Regions:
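Positively charged, structured surface patches that bind polyanionic biopolymers
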Residues: 1-91, 96-99, 103-104
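Basic DNA-binding region of bZIP-type proteins
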Residues: 101-125
């Protein structure tokens, strides 16, 4: 099961408090939004956190935010420092810090499975 690190400081981190303030919500709500963002990111983002080709409306939809408020929620995530705007969409800021162990684990498993397949194939050819 995929996972990401949820640090104990997230709930009261200045970035989280800023996000809550910008969206006129309490910090617990902001933490929930961030958990949605990060859990969705496990499937939607690349290893570097890149949400390539996705618009603000796409991000808002993934977070179950009303389409007419897409710019508000994504703008707040950018202003708070959780998303970075790129020329081709968005990047989840410091994504590798949150999900890096998952990507490393997936890579090790791929390599291990490939070695197993190679050994099996070599035995079959003997």
């Amino acid at each position: 099961m995929p996972w990401f690190e949820a640090h104990d400081t997230m709930a009261r981190h200045p970035k989280t408090l800023k996000l809550a303030r910008l969206l006129n919500q309490d910090r617990r709500w902001a933490v929930g939004l961030l958990h949605d963002l990060f859990s969705w990111g496990l499937y939607a983002a690349g290893k570097d956190g890149e949400l390539k080709g996705l618009t603000a409306a796409d991000v808002a939809q993934a977070l179950d935010y009303p389409p007419k408020k897409a710019q508000v929620v994504v703008g707040a995530l950018v202003a708070a420092g959780y998303l970075d705007e790129t020329s081709d969409g968005y990047t989840i800021h410091d994504w590798y810090d949150y999900a890096g162990k998952l990507y490393d684990s997936r890579e090790k498993n791929r390599e291990k499975n490939q070695r197993y397949r190679d050994r099996k194939r070599a035995k079959e050819c003997q």
